[in-house]
């Protein structure tokens, strides 16, 4: 029999190709995690051993050592019988002795087996009474690094079987395409799991490094391929899976903060969606509560929560005349503003969970987005607006409020106020022309929708400050508002920075400016906390007005980016 060839020629080929592949693929791999996965796969010792065997067999195959005959053992038997009929001599006796040795007989038998290619195992015949529906078993071997497997398991309460509950998108199990929801788990690395709890199996998986071998019974249920496009949502609440008692696997949960943009990877489960942070290079998804499930949980908790309303001051509202801070006591807020049906398709003020969003970038021909400023009395909204107008009066504009009071001698119609009759004001209220309105000393004051449109029509950025409960009615396709919450600093900083400042006190009948009091500071902090707690999910940005110049510069930078950069907006604004 010809010997196996040796030399460098047989050490080339597939083995060296596998060794060089990771370096060759590096420029084409998107993430470091994928590259690490490739290094782990191609660096497996068992894979290298198989490749070496393949190379040796390949070199042997090239020599094409065809057998001279396929029955060497039978030929030896015939020769022995023939020689026994001959007159014996020393050579015949030596040959008969050699052919009778067990080692020689075994060698000839192996030769015939290889020559006849009859070395494949012979399977036993299929029993006649076999059950056609008997479960088939599949052996799966996955190679993973330190990342989680990316699958959750559960125990069937009726059968006691351990099954795959879900496959996390982008995880090792998902990328392999070998494990599916509903598969029954029988063994992990040779360890039977029929009598184990899911927690014990998870511990086995977490302790396994490198390759993991599964013995499973495939699910008979066919999976429907997901046809979902890219869906992005804005989180309207904070979430920490470690504090969620309902989540099936805390390690598989995805934490997020209010305002984060998430990409939905799967909505197959009505209770738990799979998502990842937008822009995250990590392909693995995590579990988050679905919109329906979160709304239901919040609705069930609502009777136990005491929501503290914004404290209403008396009819002598501070800063009322110039900033249109309507009387908190007698103020009536328009509940059905123009186009509010569109904005209420997603009523975030009731149960804030998620809002579907899409990227938006203002085009040159588009009107500017409405800038809505929200903040407690005394925080500095008017001063910030004044500085913005002074910085560029041609670019920024403010609305002129309507009133039914008599015009004073030093006032001009359309400058300080738009003066209209009480009958016309009430008519406009009935046809939903006011964003918000109220009554002060038997006179009506209000901010009309037409005033906002008038500023935007002049190709200016409209600066509008309103009460926070009005914001949701402004969130329409027409205005595309960008809401900024001006937040006060700590009360210690207020005492330091506002000790010489003045406020129009609500306790002064004349509405004259007086120095801040300790009560004013406390009221400002308390109002800001309530605003952020109840309406924070509607705010696009929060700016702390600790130093007026710093706050103004941050505000100005925000506006500049708003006009040029891409931002996330409700999908209804672009697809209405």
UniProtKB/Swiss-Prot annotation:
Residues 228-298 form the SH3 domain. It is a peripheral membrane protein. It comes from the Eukaryota. Phosphorylated by aPKC which promotes dissociation from the cell cortex. Signal peptide: none annotated. Residues 139-220 form the PDZ domain. The modification Phosphoserine is found at residue 409. Keywords: Cell junction, Cell membrane, Cytoplasm, Membrane, Phosphoprotein, Repeat, SH3 domain, Tight junction. Residues 10-64, 65-122 form the L27 domain. The keyword Protein transport does not apply. GO terms for molecular function: molecular adaptor activity; protein domain specific binding. GO terms for cellular component: adherens junction; bicellular tight junction; cell cortex; lateral plasma membrane; MPP7-DLG1-LIN7 complex. The phospho-regulated basic and hydrophobic (PRBH) motif is sufficient and important for interaction with phospholipids permitting cortical localization. Phosphorylation of the PRBH motif by aPKC inhibits the association of the protein with the cortical membrane. Belongs to the MAGUK family. This is MAGUK p55 subfamily member 7. The gene is Mpp7.
């Amino acid at each position: 029999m010809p010997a196996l060839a040796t030399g460098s020629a047989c050490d080339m080929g597939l083995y060296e190709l596998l060794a060089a592949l990771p370096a060759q693929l590096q420029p084409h791999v998107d993430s470091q995690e994928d590259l690490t996965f490739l290094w782990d796969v191609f660096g497996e010792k068992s894979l290298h051993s198989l490749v070496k065997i393949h190379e040796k067999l390949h070199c042997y195959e090239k020599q094409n050592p065809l057998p001279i005959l396929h029955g060497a053992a039978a030929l030896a038997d015939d020769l022995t019988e023939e020689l026994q009929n001959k007159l014996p001599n020393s050579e015949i006796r030596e040959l008969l002795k050699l052919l009778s040795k067990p080692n020689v007989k075994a060698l000839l038998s192996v030769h015939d087996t290889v020559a006849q290619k009859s070395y494949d195992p012979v399977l036993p015949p299929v029993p006649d009474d076999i059950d056609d529906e008997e479960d088939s078993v599949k052996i799966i071997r996955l190679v993973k690094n330190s990342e989680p497997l990316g699958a959750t398991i559960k125990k069937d309460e009726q059968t006691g079987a351990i099954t795959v509950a879900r496959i996390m998108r982008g995880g090792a199990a998902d990328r392999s395409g070998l494990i599916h929801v509903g598969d029954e788990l029988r063994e992990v690395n040779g360890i039977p799991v029929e009598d184990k709890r899911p927690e014990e199996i998870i511990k086995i998986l977490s302790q396994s490094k490198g390759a993991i071998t599964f013995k499973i019974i495939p699910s008979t249920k066919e999976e429907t391929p997901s046809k979902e496009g890219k869906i992005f949502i804005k989180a309207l609440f904070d979430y920490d899976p470690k504090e969620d008692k309902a989540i099936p696997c805390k390690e598989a949960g995805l934490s997020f903060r209010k305002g984060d943009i998430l990409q939905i990877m799967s909505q197959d489960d009505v209770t738990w969606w799979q998502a990842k942070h937008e822009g995250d290079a990590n392909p693995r998804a995590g579990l988050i509560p679905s919109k329906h499930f979160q709304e239901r949980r919040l609705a069930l908790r609502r009777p136990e929560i005491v929501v503290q309303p914004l404290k209403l001051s008396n009819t002598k509202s501070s800063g009322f005349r110039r900033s249109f801070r309507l009387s908190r006591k007698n103020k009536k807020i328009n509940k059905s503003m123009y186009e509010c049906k569109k904005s209420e398709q997603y009523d975030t003020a009731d149960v804030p969970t998620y809002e579907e969003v899409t990227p938006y970038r203002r085009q040159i021909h588009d009107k500017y987005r409405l800038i809505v400023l929200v903040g407690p009395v005394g925080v500095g909204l008017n001063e910030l607006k004044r500085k913005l107008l002074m910085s560029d009066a041609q670019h920024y504009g403010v609305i002129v409020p309507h009133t039914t009071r008599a015009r004073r001698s030093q006032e001009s119609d359309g400058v300080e106020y738009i003066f209209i009759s009480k009958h016309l004001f009430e008519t406009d209220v009935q046809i939903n022309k006011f964003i918000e309105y109220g009554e002060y000393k038997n006179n009506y004051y209000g901010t009309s929708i037409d005033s906002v449109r008038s500023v935007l029509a002049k190709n200016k950025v409209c600066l509008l400050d309103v009460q926070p409960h009005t914001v949701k009615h402004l969130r329409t396709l027409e205005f595309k508002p960008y809401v900024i919450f001006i937040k006060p600093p700590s009360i210690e900083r207020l005492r330091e920075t506002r000790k010489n400042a003045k406020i129009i006190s609500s306790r002064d009948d004349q509405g004259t400016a007086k120095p801040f009091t300790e009560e004013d500071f406390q009221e400002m902090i308390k109002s800001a906390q309530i605003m952020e707690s109840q309406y924070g999910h509607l705010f696009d940005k929060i700016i702390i007005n600790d130093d007026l110049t710093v706050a103004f510069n941050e505000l100005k930078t925000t506006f500049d980016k708003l006009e040029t950069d891409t931002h996330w907006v409700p999908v209804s604004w672009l697809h209405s």
